């Protein structure tokens, strides 16, 4: 039986929203450093193994639960077992905590973009080096851009699943892909780029020499996997609740982590 509430208007729209949930600042900023600090290619190997044997299964399970119940995280677990709503509340709580710092970073990015554009079209350079110091010293500005970022999110969510989140994701995700390719090309042309690539990708298997260091890498890779794929916070359950019964969950579950 199809859900009576709204649904994704297309599988492409769902994929863009789900990939957008997975590809965030945690990957752009955090993942490269975690790779380099935890054995480079050795960390990547552990991460890929976890995604293949754990991430795919958890994501498929969450999407299945969401589509089957047609409810958000709390309601879905309550539908499975009346004693399990606390699992959904924990997921919502973790998402709320993540929003706490993502909204601040989002406001900072908006302020940086505004400063860059104003100075670029004004013919002046933008002093990126001093930006962060001036940013944290300007509390009213921080609060203002934080509020603006939250307001934009509220407007998008109020548009509904297809008219808001899906429509925005169809534009934002291709734009993000173009920006990432631009950044990759730009970074590759910078002095010291090769040293950075070596730091990230050259495997250092000495991290597996002791049980403690191995579990440190495993813990870091597992945390990155759950964070990167938006697992355990109810996002995929909620997205799955708006999926049509005709969509192929297995294929979607493969596409999202790979993207």
How should these model regions be labeled?
Residues 1-30, 58-63, 67-79, 85-89, ...:
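Membrane-interface "cap" regions at the ends of multi-pass membrane proteins
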Residues 2-5, 34-38, 68-90, 103-162, ...:
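Inter-helical loop and helix-membrane interface segments of multi-pass membrane transporters/permeases
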Residues 2-8, 12, 170-259:
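Membrane-embedded translocation segments of transport machinery
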Residues 10-48, 234-243, 252-254, 258:
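Transmembrane helix-boundary motif of multi-pass solute transporters/channels
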Residues 16-22, 48-53, 90-101, 148-155, ...:
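Hydrophobic alpha-helical transmembrane segments of multi-pass membrane proteins
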Residues 35-61, 87, 141-142:
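Extracellular loop-to-transmembrane helix junctions
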Residues 50-56, 90-111, 175-185, 259:
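Hydrophobic alpha-helical membrane-insertion segments
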Residues 51-63, 67, 73-74, 149-158, ...:
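Central hydrophobic cores of alpha-helical transmembrane segments in multi-pass inner-membrane proteins
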């Amino acid at each position: 039986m199809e859900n009576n509430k709204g649904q994704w208007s297309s599988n492409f729209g769902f994929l863009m929203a789900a990939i957008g949930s997975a590809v965030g600042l945690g990957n752009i900023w955090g993942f490269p450093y975690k790779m380099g600090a935890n054995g480079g290619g050795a960390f990547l190997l552990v991460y890929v193994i976890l995604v293949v044997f754990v991430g795919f299964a958890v994501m498929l399970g969450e999407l299945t639960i969401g589509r089957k119940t047609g409810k958000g995280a709390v309601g879905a677990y309550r539908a499975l077992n009346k004693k399990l709503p606390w699992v959904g509340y924990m997921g919502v709580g973790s998402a709320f905590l993540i929003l706490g710092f993502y909204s601040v970073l989002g406001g900072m990015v908006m302020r940086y973009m505004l400063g860059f554009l104003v100075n670029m079209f004004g013919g002046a350079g933008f002093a990126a080096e001093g930006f962060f110091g001036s940013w944290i010293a300007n509390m009213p500005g921080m609060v203002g851009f934080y509020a603006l970022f939250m307001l934009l999110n509220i407007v998008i969510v109020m548009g509904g699943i297809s008219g808001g989140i899906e429509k925005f994701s169809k534009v934002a995700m291709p734009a993000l892909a173009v920006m990432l390719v631009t950044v990759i090309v730009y970074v590759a042309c910078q002095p010291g780029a090769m040293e950075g690539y070596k730091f990230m990708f050259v495997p250092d298997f000495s991290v597996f020499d002791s049980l403690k260091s191995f579990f440190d890498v495993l813990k870091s890779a597992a945390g990155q996997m759950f964070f990167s794929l938006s697992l355990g916070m109810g996002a995929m359950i909620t997205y799955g609740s708006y999926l049509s019964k005709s969509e192929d969950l297995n294929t979607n579950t493969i596409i999202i982590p790979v993207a």
